[in-house]
Amino acid sequence: DGRPFVLEISNPRIREIDLDELEKRSNDNDMAGYNSLHFVQREAVERYKGAAADKVYRVHVKADGKVNKEAVVNAALSFKDANIDQRTPRRVEHRRADLVRKRKIHWIKADAITDDSFDLELETDSGTYVKEFVSGDDGRSVPSFSERLGIQCKVETLDVLAINYQEPMKG
């Protein structure tokens, strides 16, 4: 699916551009891939900025101790439509207001479970701090996956698999 984005170029030197050619040339390297490039009006930019977007992630998690497969699966299942409270994470508190935000974990599936690691696929509300949800961020994310599992865990890799935009109400 990819991650939608808006790019504004102020005072461009070239005013006419072939988006198909730009897309082709941009995709000639392995850094990133682009598709469906198109021009939009300012109103579309404002709608995009105001849209909520539930996201589906895949994370590889490392545990501080030995994990039990059944316990990981049960912890994952316990978060079906679960509400969590997330205080602004330490890693972003220098640029975000220190608030407690209410978020929802829609579902979690666990797999690739070994003695001390596992993968989670999960869908969350827009704005959920997934790394902090898994680790607990020293009690700033409650409940956390680590808390439910009973073992401290840390996200080693995180991939966004899908972004499900809900266009804001017009009016």
Where are these regions (language model features)?
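RNA pseudouridine synthases
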Residues: 1-171
